[in-house]
């Protein structure tokens, strides 16, 4: 049915176009004959218009009616480039009229939809705007400052933590060199004679209730070595020197020490020998054996190896 309808529309359109062309050709031929009969002076605008109206009202001439409809001013102003033949078909007229109605009514509806949509969007933006603005104020303020401060402090702490282990590994292991002065017989050293000999050799009673040999003989400056009691409790504390007695005293120095370790050892050994001579005692090693040249060489070798390991 659709194909048959399309064929009929095409055939009708062709027939109307042929009829229109024939009418135009006939009208043009008749117009030339009429203008040829009249003089030029009688041709004006006032006479031409009544003749067109007379041609329009003549019911016998179909071609004049078609010609009048084509030259209608309202039709030419609206669609000057459209084909006049197609408009004469009723099927095509229905199609065009339906499209025109849809265009006329659809455009206002589209505009109304846009207006309503814009109004709703504007209302939703105004309602949501305060909540959206407040959120960044709560989030951005702590994030812009605190991470930088945390990074700065964390970097400094990391440097301190790295420096501390390095300083600890540089420190050498503490070593102690010990000499002893022991009484020769069963008679112990009496405090009066013992303390007098110690003071004459530059030892000063001080911290931890023992005697110390300082850099200065007056008892000031760094401690080079110290002297303690061989017997329990190890201190040389006394209220009355005459009532104090012990079987021996211990000399000790630490490695590392202030100054030169070998010179401090020689000074400690010399002091121990003088006190032993004053009291009639013997100089012993750290195991409380009599001091021998080999053991003294062992002490000095220990000092040299320590200095080489920590040079």
UniProtKB/Swiss-Prot annotation:
It is a single-pass type I membrane protein. SUPFAM superfamilies: Cell-division protein ZipA, C-terminal domain (SSF64383). Belongs to the ZipA family. This is Cell division protein ZipA. Essential cell division protein that stabilizes the FtsZ protofilaments by cross-linking them and that serves as a cytoplasmic membrane anchor for the Z ring. Also required for the recruitment to the septal ring of downstream cell division proteins. GO terms for cellular component: cell division site; plasma membrane. It comes from the Bacteria. InterPro entries: Cell_div_ZipA, ZipA_FtsZ-bd_C, ZipA_FtsZ-bd_C_sf. Residues 32-60 are annotated as: Disordered. It comes from Vibrio vulnificus (strain YJ016). It is found in: Cell inner membrane. Residues 32-54 have a biased composition (Basic and acidic residues). Residues 1-5 are periplasmic. The chain crosses the membrane at residues 6-26. Interacts with FtsZ via their C-terminal domains. Residues 27-311 are cytoplasmic. Keywords: Cell cycle, Cell division, Cell inner membrane, Cell membrane, Membrane, Transmembrane, Transmembrane helix. One of its GO terms (biological process) is division septum assembly.
């Amino acid at each position: 049915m659709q194909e048959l309808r399309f064929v009929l529309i095409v055939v009708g359109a062709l027939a109307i176009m042929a009829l229109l062309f024939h009418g135009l050709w006939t009208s043009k031929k008749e117009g030339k004959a009429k203008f040829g009969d009249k003089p030029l002076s009688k041709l004006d605008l006032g006479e031409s218009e009544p003749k067109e109206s007379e041609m329009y009202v003549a019911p016998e001439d179909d071609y004049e009616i078609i010609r009048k409809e084509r030259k209608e001013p309202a039709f030419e102003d609206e669609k000057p480039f459209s084909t006049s033949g197609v408009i004469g078909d009723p099927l095509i007229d229905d199609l065009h009229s339906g499209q025109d109605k849809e265009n006329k009514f659809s455009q206002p509806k589209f505009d109304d939809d846009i207006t309503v949509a814009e109004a709703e969007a504007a209302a939703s933006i105004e309602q949501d705007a305060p909540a959206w603005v407040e959120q960044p104020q709560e989030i951005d303020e702590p994030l812009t400052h605190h991470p930088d401060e945390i990074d700065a402090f964390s970097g400094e702490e990391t440097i301190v933590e790295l420096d501390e282990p390095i300083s600890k590994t540089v420190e050498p292991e503490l070593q102690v060199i010990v000499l002893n002065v022991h009484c020769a017989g069963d008679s112990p050293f009496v405090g009066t004679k013992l303390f007098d000999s110690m003071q004459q050799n530059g030892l000063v009673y001080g911290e931890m209730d023992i005697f110390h040999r300082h850099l200065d003989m007056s008892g000031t400056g760094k401690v080079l070595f110290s002297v303690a009691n061989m017997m329990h409790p190890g201190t040389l504390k006394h209220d009355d020197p005459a009532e104090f007695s012990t079987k021996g005293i211990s000399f000790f120095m630490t490695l590392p020490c202030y100054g030169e370790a070998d010179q401090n050892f020689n000074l400690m050994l010399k002091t121990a020998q003088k006190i032993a001579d004053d009291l009639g005692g013997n100089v012993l090693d750290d195991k409380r054996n009599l001091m021998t040249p080999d053991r003294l060489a062992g002490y000095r070798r220990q000092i040299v190896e320590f200095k080489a390991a920590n040079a």
